[in-house]
Every structure is written in C-alpha cells, then in structure tokens.
C-alpha cells in the first residue's frame, strides 16, 4: 500500500491513524 508518511499497519495491512 502507498503510505504517505509513517503509519503503522494492522495485521490486515490497513494503515491506522
């Protein structure tokens, strides 16, 4: 996934804020 910054990913690979 394209992450504009340093967002951690949950186990599904989705970024959370």
Swiss-Prot record:
Key words, A-Z: Ion channel impairing toxin, Neurotoxin, Secreted, Toxin
Residues spanning the membrane: none
Top-level taxonomy: Eukaryota, Metazoa, Ecdysozoa, Arthropoda, Chelicerata
GO CC annotations, alphabetized: extracellular region
Organism domain of life: Eukaryota
Keyword Secreted in record: yes
Function: Binds to sodium channels and affects the channel activation process. Has high toxic effect on mice but no effect on B.fusca and C.partellus larvae.
Protein name, as recorded: Mammal toxin PlMT
Tissue/organ expression: Expressed by the venom gland.
